[in-house]
Amino acid sequence: MNEKILKTLEYDKIQQALLGQVVTANGRQLVQAMQPLTDPVAVQQALDETADGASALRLKGGIPVPQLENIDPALKRVDIGAVLNGQELASISRVLQTVSAIDKFLTDLQDQIDFRQLYTLQESLTVLPQLSRRLKTAVDPDGTLTDEASPQLHGVREQIKSIEGEIRGKMTNYTRGAQSKYLSDPIVTIRDDRYVIPVKAEYRAKFGGVVHDQSATGQTLFIEPQAIVALNNRLREAQLAEVAEINRILAELSNELAPYTGQIKANAAVLGHFDFINAKARLAKAEKATEPLVSADNDVLLRDARHPLIDPHKVVGNDIPLGDKYQAMVITGPNTGGKTITLKTLGLLQLMGQSGLFIPADDESRIGIFDEVFADIGDEQSIEQNLSTFSAHMDNIVHILKQLSQNSLVLFDELGAGTDPQEGAALAIAILDAVGEVGAYVVATTHYPELKLYGYNTAKTINASMEFDSKTLQPTYRLLVGVPGRSNAFDISARLGLPGVIVERAKSMISSDSHELNNMISDLEKQRKAAETAYEAARRQLADAQSVHDELAAAYKKFTTERDAQLQQAKDKANTLVDKAQTKADKIIKQLRQMQLTNPGTVKENQLIAAKTALKQLHQDEPLQKNRILRREREKQALHVGDEVKVASYDQTGTLLEQFDKKHWQVQLGILKMKVPTDELKKIKSSKQSAAQRPVVKVSGGGMSGPSTTLDLRGERYDQAMADLDQYIDAALLAGYPSVTIIHGLGTGAIRNGVTQYLKRNRQVKTYGFAPQNAGGSGATIVNFK
């Protein structure tokens, strides 16, 4: 992008605002190097990064990037074998700690926020935990080495503290004891790195020792008393040892950094990028900016676009469309109406968007991707100072025409001004034609009436104007697309008190065509205002409807959530009760089994049926949908005399003998005939086949013959197989078998899986597993009981 346009549109002031948001040296470099991008993919990626930063700012207060100095010079010194000082090591330590903090920050958010680019940027970080801990332990943030930097440093510092304590104790005797009267002041100070006391010159001989300094008047001598000379010597030796150890540690730490300088430098650059993203997000928040859509076809639509350098309390937002149905817009109308500001707003927001910045415009605004943006705006002064002077720069226009392409955006302010009006209008039309022939996009402002007709008659060109309030005689600074500007001179003059005779005489002097054109423009303005009023009413109604819809959706979501929670709570409670009852049932079965083992022949079939319950059938399935399917399936089944059914309350299979009424049937269960409620009956299909395959436990008053140690479920339907398995396991338990074999075959695996799930839930099963290969392999399961 050419440098001239960046200056003309005050792009540098956006950079200055962004610089106020960065906190790292690398971040500042990225802001200073920021330029509008021309690759659509790169533009979208830059906008994605800003969107990620905005999400992090909104949800977590931003990416945790602290102030970081430029560590590149320090790393270069390490590369040549130099020893870094404490401040340089502290700066590098902060970089490494920040890398770890950001890596953890983003890792923790991976299940919460779907960032578009930050996770990819995170992959560029190299976390160096050991080196980071070493520096953090050894170096304080101010660059001072800590006592934990080495045992030797800790020891020598403890020695220094001890000696200093001895010195302070002896010095206290001088400042507070009998000899304090010989001192100028009862204080202890330091001269030449040694502890001294201020002695009156005439009492020099009272203390002996060494004189290190004297006052300006010579009346006070700073004396190191003889009694502490040895202590000061020991202190000095310890201090020198401390310095030597510090230098050794600094060299050691510098050597430890040497293998990682490239990774640390790359980390610092990535942290600068995170800082840059943070800054873009903060600037967007400050400007109430939004993410623009990117149009590869240069279909620009800025909604309620505001210039970012104008006071937000005074700026007027405008909708600025360009590129969809027309590539040229001619804005006509009087001066000081906001035409120049509109041009600059379009140009600057386009540059900001192509730089990956959010723009001060409403949601769903679109920017294009232009290779170049050119402008001929005569004043080139700060719009913050509200200065608008207009002059023609034909040399600049010639330069623009030589460089533009079909992917250029051109902004002309007061095109053709500064010369004879007739010639200026002709030049303006010719220049616009030249731009149109290339296929470039152009917005031009002018006050020449001839260009109004140009806007009507030229393909892909539309007129526009800046609104003027004829009642207040003030511009509103609102852009009216599709409506050319009209002169308000007659209305303004009349309202300011110009005699009506003069106004009417002036009107008679203009051509009828001009008069009709002004009337037509006036009618267009009225129609536009009516359309705007209708649009606003419709928009408000739509917003109200959307609000009601959102409230209803939220209420419905809350209802369904609470309903499901209550149903789940009820199911959990029911399952708890069923589990307790199941435990009791297991105890009963165990007792029956014990009775059969200790006293055969005492267990009757009616006792077995009464002990065996259908509590497992009452256990609620987790998915609610499954229960509904089962209920619907039950409703479809019609019962008839002779049908083989399963009695849910006893978990037994029987035959229907007679229907008493709609709610009860007589069922043959073994040797018993029982009256059973209809809703406890389930019809079993292919009953003859099932009856032939079902294992039978023969029970009589005098004894009970045990079932086989093998159950073959092959060929059965799933429901019948599960019922047979349940009955067989109970019979095997009552028979006292230590283990049995269930043959289920391979097939689709449905029955095998059902067997596995059943055995997993049964409390009487100790272990289970597939049979050996020579005994059926995965087609059979061996069950061991407790």
Curated annotation (Swiss-Prot):
GO process annotations (BP): mismatch repair; negative regulation of DNA recombination; rescue of stalled ribosome
Residues covered by the Smr domain: 711-786
Binding-site residues, ATP: 333-340
GO molecular function: ATP binding; ATP hydrolysis activity; ATP-dependent DNA damage sensor activity; endonuclease activity; mismatched DNA binding; ribosomal large subunit binding; rRNA binding
The keyword Cell inner membrane is assigned to this record: no
EC numbers on record: 3.1.-.-, 3.6.4.-
Key words, A-Z: ATP-binding, DNA-binding, Endonuclease, Hydrolase, Nuclease, Nucleotide-binding, RNA-binding, rRNA-binding
UniProt cross-references to InterPro entries, sorted A to Z: DNA_mismatch_repair_MutS_C (IPR000432), DNA_mismatch_repair_MutS_core (IPR007696), DNA_mismatch_repair_MutS_sf (IPR036187), MSSS (IPR046893), MutS (IPR045076), MutS2 (IPR005747), P-loop_NTPase (IPR027417), Smr_dom (IPR002625)
Tree of life domain: Bacteria
Signal peptide: none
Enzyme's top EC category: hydrolase
Purpose of the protein: Endonuclease that is involved in the suppression of homologous recombination and thus may have a key role in the control of bacterial genetic diversity. Acts as a ribosome collision sensor, splitting the ribosome into its 2 subunits. Detects stalled/collided 70S ribosomes which it binds and splits by an ATP-hydrolysis driven conformational change. Acts upstream of the ribosome quality control system (RQC), a ribosome-associated complex that mediates the extraction of incompletely synthesized nascent chains from stalled ribosomes and their subsequent degradation. Probably generates substrates for RQC.
NCBIfam families with a match to the protein in the record: mutS2
Family according to the record: Belongs to the DNA mismatch repair MutS family. MutS2 subfamily.
HAMAP family in the cross-refs: MutS2 (MF_00092)
Subunit-structure text: Homodimer. Binds to stalled ribosomes, contacting rRNA.
Name this protein carries in UniProt: Endonuclease MutS2
